[in-house]
Regions:
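Compact, glycine-rich, soluble single-domain proteins
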Residues: 2-134
Length: 134
């Protein structure tokens, strides 16, 4: 099969972000137990100076991202009193996690990850304040 048949028809489709995924959240998988459903941060396609990143650079950055937006939480997330004295995050928070943490689930326009509650390393107010390029 020719390689061009394997590529998406719109390589620069609108990037997923917390604002435009709201209508899709109800259709996404429900995390069970102590898991979280997270939308990984998608870097912008252009720098502040106007330089465009190649599709390969964007794909690498998407895979290597370490920030995500919490979409859903399982009913047991942060309930283990031996590990947590309070939740580390809540729905609507931007969180940081290890580069290859969680299970990746491709969805229309990007991917979501299912993380264990203890894979969250911290919260961050603005994911653009962290460099996401490798």
């Amino acid at each position: 099969m020719p390689e061009e048949n394997l590529k998406p028809s719109e390589p620069h489709a609108k990037r997923l972000d917390p604002d435009n995924i709201k209508d899709m959240v109800s259709q996404l998988p429900e995390p069970v137990g102590y898991r979280l459903l997270v939308l990984p941060f998608t870097p912008k396609e252009k720098t502040k100076g106007g330089i465009l990143f190649s599709q390969e650079q964007l794909d690498k950055a998407r895979i290597a991202t370490t920030c995500g937006y919490v979409l859903k939480m399982g009913d047991l997330a942060y309930q283990d009193k031996e590990k947590f004295n309070k939740p580390w995050c809540k729905i609507g928070d931007w969180v940081m996690f290890a580069r290859y943490a969680g299970a990746r689930l491709p969805i229309e326009g990007g991917e979501v990850r299912i993380l264990n509650d203890d894979e969250v390393l911290g919260t961050i107010g603005d994911p653009e304040s962290v460099l996401h390029y490798i």
